[in-house]
């Protein structure tokens, strides 16, 4: 398996591909079942956001190695309308799509590191990482 893979998100089936690849990478890297589920859920949520809010974008999934730490990094990028108020978007229960509002804050809880950058009318980039314990 490659150490990184980019998946273009253009249709709902691409979300499934991103989930599958993330799970396979997590297994190869040695993550336990619970962390595999967390990683898969995070990829699902982030790629779903790309599809719902920007229609197209990409997910980059890659193995990480920093010093004696190993893990996985997921980066989602889109060129959608952006998030005007990131602080509000990170609050539990907030949603612009009539959802439960658990997406971004839930993803942050699932992963060890979470970073979001967004510019209105330019798009959003979310980077998350999970480290092997």
Please place each PLM-identified region on the residue numbering.
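Bergerat-fold GHKL ATPase/HATPase_c domain
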Residues: 1-41
């Amino acid at each position: 398996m490659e150490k990184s893979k980019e998946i273009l998100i253009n249709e709902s089936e691409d979300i499934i591909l991103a989930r599958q690849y993330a799970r396979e990478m997590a297994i190869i890297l040695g993550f336990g079942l619970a962390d595999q589920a967390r990683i898969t859920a995070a990829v699902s949520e982030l790629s779903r956001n790309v599809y719902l809010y920007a229609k197209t974008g990409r997910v980059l999934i890659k193995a990480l190695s920093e010093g004696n730490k190993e893990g996985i990094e997921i980066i989602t990028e889109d060129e959608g309308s952006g998030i005007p108020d990131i602080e509000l978007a990170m609050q539990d229960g907030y949603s612009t799509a009539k959802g439960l509002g658990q997406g971004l804050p839930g993803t942050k809880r699932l992963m060890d590191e979470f970073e979001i950058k967004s510019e209105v009318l330019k798009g959003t980039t979310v980077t998350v990482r999970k480290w092997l314990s």
